[in-house]
A protein has these predicted regions:
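Amphipathic, charged alpha-helical segments and their helix-to-coil junctions
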Residues: 24-34, 46, 109-157
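Amphipathic alpha-helical segments
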Residues: 21, 28, 39-122
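A generic membrane alpha-helix/interface feature
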Residues: 5, 68, 83, 142-145, ...
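Alpha-helix termini
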Residues: 15, 61-63, 137
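General helical structural elements
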Residues: 6-7, 44, 79, 141
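Positively charged n-region of N-terminal signal peptides that target proteins for export
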Residues: 1-4, 19
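Hydrophobic h-region of N-terminal signal peptides that target proteins for export
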Residues: 9-18
Length: 157
């Protein structure tokens, strides 16, 4: 797990403050694919599935990952907006960024609930519950990595 944490820290720290102004869509796509690949690997290594369970789980997981991926794209746009306005965030922009951040969090929870419910229809709670725990840990690592790479909002001088 330490290797995973270091991997995510490396990925997000590479999006340092100075580099964010020139976001490259290919670079962002590469980071997303790396994160998705590592996330899938972590889930596979930590979730003991029978063949029947795997045949039911992975298609739902892939749908979940695709739905969540759309939120990642929106989160990148919010981060870009934050960085581009970093030296001049007024009340309107600040409130808008906070509103967008809350919206993304609520939508992420809605997506997670939707796919957890789909999994519960075909898999035992022990499998779904463990996946839920793994998924939340991965999300926490990603969030910490992302937050560590962004500067805090400047205070008025």
């Amino acid at each position: 797990m330490k290797k995973v944490i270091l991997f995510f820290l490396f990925l997000f720290c590479s999006l340092s403050f100075g580099q964010v102004e020139s976001f490259e869509s290919d670079y962002i796509q590469m980071l997303k694919e790396d994160i998705q690949g590592v996330s899938r690997q972590i889930v596979a290594e930590n979730l003991s599935l029978t063949e029947d369970q795997a045949n039911k789980f992975w298609p739902i997981y892939d749908e979940y990952d695709a739905a969540y991926d759309k939120l990642v794209d929106e989160r990148v746009k919010v981060i870009e907006e934050y960085i581009m306005n970093y030296y001049g965030i007024d009340d309107e922009v600040g409130k808008d960024l906070i509103s967008k951040s809350f919206d993304l969090k609520y939508r992420a929870i809605d997506i997670q609930k939707e796919y957890i419910d789909k999994m519960l229809e075909v898999l035992p709670i022990s499998v779904v519950g463990k996946f839920f725990q793994i998924d939340n840990r991965i999300a926490a690592i990603i969030d910490i990595s992302r937050m560590a790479s962004l500067p805090l909002l400047r205070e008025e001088e």
